[in-house]
Amino acid sequence: MAKGEGHILAQNKKARHDYHIVETVEAGIVLTGTEIKSVRAARIQLKDGFAQIKNGEAWLVNVHIAPFEQGNIWNADPERTRKLLLKKREITHLENELKGSGMTLVPLKVYLKDGFAKVLIGLAKGKHEYDKRETIKRRDQERDIKKQMKHYNAR
């Protein structure tokens, strides 16, 4: 667990497969009371989510937080756009990186830190299909080498 992060509630494994992660930034999320209860129960899905910057503010889009079971009328829309809490300097830095560079912001993981929900946002560049195949091939080769070393050392 890097950067002093707490209990990991959700991870976006697909993001590391589909993108080259250039840089990561930790951000807070503005949630309602029933949403934080669902997040603490790990009922959050980051798979199709992304972040965008509008009017000098960062927003988390397409992240699904399941409705809290006992929340009835207080539950918010599960797919609503949520504000990210970042410093102005971080927002301008990310905005400059995103301009005309083919980069995007993807949520990598959600975790609790000192009782607050935090999201790790990655500044990412899309991978081509051959990059994905190369990554899978390299991972398989490393796995085979470890297996052979384990077998060799067991003698």
From Swiss-Prot:
InterPro entries: SmpB, SsrA-bd_prot, SsrA-bd_prot_CS. Coiled coil: none annotated. Required for rescue of stalled ribosomes mediated by trans-translation. Binds to transfer-messenger RNA (tmRNA), required for stable association of tmRNA with ribosomes. tmRNA and SmpB together mimic tRNA shape, replacing the anticodon stem-loop with SmpB. tmRNA is encoded by the ssrA gene; the 2 termini fold to resemble tRNA(Ala) and it encodes a 'tag peptide', a short internal open reading frame. During trans-translation Ala-aminoacylated tmRNA acts like a tRNA, entering the A-site of stalled ribosomes, displacing the stalled mRNA. GO terms for biological process: trans-translation. This is SsrA-binding protein. GO terms for molecular function: RNA binding. It comes from Streptococcus pyogenes serotype M3 (strain ATCC BAA-595 / MGAS315). One of its GO terms (cellular component) is cytosol.
